[in-house]
């Protein structure tokens, strides 16, 4: 009688845990410059290879190589990108300390991922709408939104533009093309596709761009967004940031073990690319390509950005419990700030002295902005928006039952 082996459930495991170094060979990598650049109007069938390779521009020596090395990227744009990334990292570090001092309740930094939001922010045009997750504060910093305004939202103080209605880091700035961040995963993909469809229906020229993490690709809204984007050829860029971890869950749990996240788009008939998210030049080049496709009615593009979440998921997380403490230092794609710095220095457009001076200038700017924000209140001082604001900004004409409740509160 034939012996049938018992069934076994496969549960993916990371190659590294505390005390055991991560083997990053699980990441399919390509050499800088070796991945081809297709024509804008080619379809997903002709480009399936791009969902499994890795678009890279900067080599180990900091030189821009290959077909994605865009000569139209001006040195001034690269300098701006480096400055925004430095400013973001300093802002993040300061807000992390503020949370530890109990001045704010919660914070999420973008350490190690700064190039992705910054590069695409500088590739988009005014009027385009971004649907970010909670690690794209550099979209706003790249647009020179006052740091004190961001801090007031974090402090939930009397000058909080959202009047305390959102969790810290869940910004909303319509005038900056920054849609309200939601704590529910993958919702922004559906929202971005719907907004892009509306833009097309109106005959507008504005496109949408959305960001989610690798873990959120397991949510049903991800598949819904892909279906609508493909069927209606929505003018949208769909960004998946594969930073290896969804809180304490390794990216393989979301489906990254046997295929890539970019490959998810192929099944929906969407042109899908996989790119180095720590290579600022690759981010700008790939973003411009996808944005141009969307703006020219060539449909959506799904981009998987390979990066690494260098810090904790949030201030409520302790990554030392589930991964090696030195993981980021051994991540093969490096630090996005150091890589762009190396490239600019190689070109003669940056120096160690300017780098040091820039850091000092932004440190002083962040401290000044923090003092201004704290003058309007923090969790320690208790200065918050008036209770009356809970009745505002919902109805054009307040219904009777809310008017009665407001009267009962005496506000």
Where are these regions (language model features)?
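Short gly/pro/ser/thr-enriched loop/turn and capping motifs at secondary-structure boundaries
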Residues: 138, 244-247, 263, 309-311
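Cofactor-binding active-site loop characterized by glycine-rich and histidine/acidic residues
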Residues: 90, 97-234, 239, 250-257, ...
């Amino acid at each position: 009688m034939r012996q049938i082996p018992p069934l076994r459930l496969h549960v993916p495991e990371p190659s590294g845990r505390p005390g055991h170094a991560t083997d990053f060979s699980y990441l399919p990598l390509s050499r800088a410059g070796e991945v081809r650049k297709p024509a804008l109007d080619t379809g997903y069938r002709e480009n399936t290879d791009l969902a499994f390779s890795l678009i890279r521009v900067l080599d180990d020596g900091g030189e821009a190589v290959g077909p994605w090395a865009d000569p139209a990227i001006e040195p001034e744009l690269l300098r701006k990108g480096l400055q925004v990334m430095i400013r973001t990292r300093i802002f993040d570090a300061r807000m992390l300390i503020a949370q530890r001092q109990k001045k704010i309740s919660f914070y999420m930094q973008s350490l190690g991922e700064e190039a992705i939001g910054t590069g695409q922010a500088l590739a988009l045009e005014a009027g385009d709408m971004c649907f970010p997750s909670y690690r794209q504060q550099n979209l706003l910093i790249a647009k020179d939104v006052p740091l004190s305004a961001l801090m007031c939202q974090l402090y939930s103080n009397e000058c909080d533009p959202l009047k305390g209605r959102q969790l810290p880091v869940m910004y909303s700035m319509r005038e900056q093309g920054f849609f309200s961040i939601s704590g529910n995963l993958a919702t922004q993909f559906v929202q971005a596709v719907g907004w892009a469809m509306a833009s097309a229906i109106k005959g507008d020229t504005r496109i949408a761009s959305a960001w989610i993490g690798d873990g959120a690709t397991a949510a049903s809204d991800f598949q819904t967004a892909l279906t609508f984007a493909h069927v209606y050829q929505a003018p949208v860029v769909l960004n998946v940031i594969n930073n290896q971890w969804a809180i304490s869950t390794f990216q393989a749990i979301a489906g990254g073990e046997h295929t890539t996240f970019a490959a998810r788009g192929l099944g929906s008939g969407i042109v899908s690319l996989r790119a180095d998210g720590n290579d600022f030049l690759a981010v700008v080049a790939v973003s411009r390509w996808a944005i141009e496709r969307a703006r020219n009615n060539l449909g959506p593009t799904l981009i998987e950005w390979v990066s690494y979440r260098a810090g904790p998921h949030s201030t409520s997380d302790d990554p030392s419990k589930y991964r090696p403490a030195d993981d980021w230092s051994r991540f093969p794609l490096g630090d996005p700030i150091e890589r762009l710095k190396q490239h600019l220095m190689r070109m003669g457009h940056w120096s160690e002295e300017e780098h040091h001076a820039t850091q000092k200038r932004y440190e002083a700017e962040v401290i000044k902005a923090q003092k201004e924000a704290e003058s309007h209140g923090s969790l320690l001082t208790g200065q918050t928006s008036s209770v009356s604001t809970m009745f505002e900004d919902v109805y054009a004409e307040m219904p009777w039952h809310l008017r009665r409740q407001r009267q009962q509160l005496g506000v």
